[in-house]
């Protein structure tokens, strides 16, 4: 009886084991122009990633994407960057939903969106995500750990363009190697997945490699990217200097002036450690918080967007990221006022 039970459980596990598609990257001789149009001849040489299936809502997981919304993705690379191209069909190209907004958060509006996830160490634990909407809004994020921590404050340097065509819309994206981290090997093997959000289908999300979140975390549901050869991790060095001056002039009074200068530096020591330095920080480039009226006796908490404090922020997350964190860095730099809550 025990043997029968064991065989049954083994069969059930194998039947439910995660499907893993694979795709080969194509090495570009000449990098494509990033304009959203897949008109370079080399795109036609790349085998497409297709056969997308429903990812969310999970209650209908596994359904094939409707033929009117056929989706194909193409991946290439050279010595400097990863290149993504995609054709996303739509039955009514002139009325593809598009909503403009700011970077990162704008992709969650009433627009179609397409994204790529890269698990560059193939550990099914961490991944980088890059998103572009049908309105051309881009977003990047970093996901880490069993707790599903994800951060839209990754804010690295990459670019993407979109183009409306007769079949729907297309996109091109460039992801420099400085935007990601990967092992120093002659032949790379990465986890990868592509996904598309379709507003006209109740915001349903379809993925290239099947994702069943009833059984597996998204991190465990990556396909496999192969054939990336002889690329080297670049020097990760970013300098952000600033200089500002002010002049105060009033009639009948002597003019006065002031100035300030500072520097932020980020240096990647290796794939595991990053050195962040800041000298007389200003953080003037960071977007302002939305105004909120606080009628509760508790402190308001806002998203940390200052680059110096976002590196390694996942270390201070609780098991459920929505319930808070062990360390709230936004208090650093505030004036002490015991009368404020």
Which functions belong to the PLM regions below?
Residues 5-17:
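Hydrophobic h-region of N-terminal signal peptides that target proteins for export
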Residues 17-341:
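Structural preference for beta-rich elements and adjacent junctions enriched in aromatics
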């Amino acid at each position: 009886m025990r043997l029968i039970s064991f065989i049954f459980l083994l069969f059930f596990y194998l039947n439910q084991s995660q499907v893993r598609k694979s795709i080969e990257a194509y090495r570009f001789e000449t990098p494509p122009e990033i304009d959203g149009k897949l008109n370079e001849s080399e795109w036609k040489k790349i085998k497409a990633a297709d056969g997308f299936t429903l990812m969310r809502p999970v209650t209908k997981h596994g359904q094939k994407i409707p033929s009117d919304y056929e989706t194909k993705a193409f991946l290439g690379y050279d010595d400097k960057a990863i290149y993504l191209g995609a054709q996303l069909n739509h039955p009514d190209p002139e009325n593809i939903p598009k909503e403009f907004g700011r970077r990162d958060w704008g992709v969650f509006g009433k627009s179609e969106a397409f994204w790529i996830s890269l698990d560059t160490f193939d550990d099914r634990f961490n991944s980088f995500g890059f998103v572009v909407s049908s309105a051309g809004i881009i977003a990047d994020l970093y996901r880490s750990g069993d707790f599903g921590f994800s951060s839209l404050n990754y804010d690295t340097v990459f670019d993407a363009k979109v183009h409306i065509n007769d079949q729907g819309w297309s996109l091109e994206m460039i992801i420099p190697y400085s935007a990601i981290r990967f092992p120093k090997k002659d032949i790379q093997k990465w986890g990868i997945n592509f996904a598309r959000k379709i507003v006209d289908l109740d915001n349903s999300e379809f993925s290239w490699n099947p994702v069943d979140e009833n059984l597996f975390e998204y991190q465990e549901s990556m396909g496999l990217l192969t054939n990336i050869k002889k690329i080297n991790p670049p020097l990760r060095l970013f300098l952000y200097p600033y200089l500002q001056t002010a002049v105060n002039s009033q009639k009948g009074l002597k003019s006065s002036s002031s100035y300030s200068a500072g520097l932020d530096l980020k240096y990647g020591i290796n794939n595991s450690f990053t050195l962040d330095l800041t000298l007389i920080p200003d953080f003037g480039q960071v977007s302002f918080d939305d105004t909120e009226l606080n009628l509760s006796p508790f402190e308001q908490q806002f998203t940390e967007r200052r680059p110096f404090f976002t590196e390694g922020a996942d270390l201070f997350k609780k098991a459920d990221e929505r319930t808070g964190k062990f360390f709230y860095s936004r208090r650093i730099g505030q004036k002490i006022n015991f009368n404020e809550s």
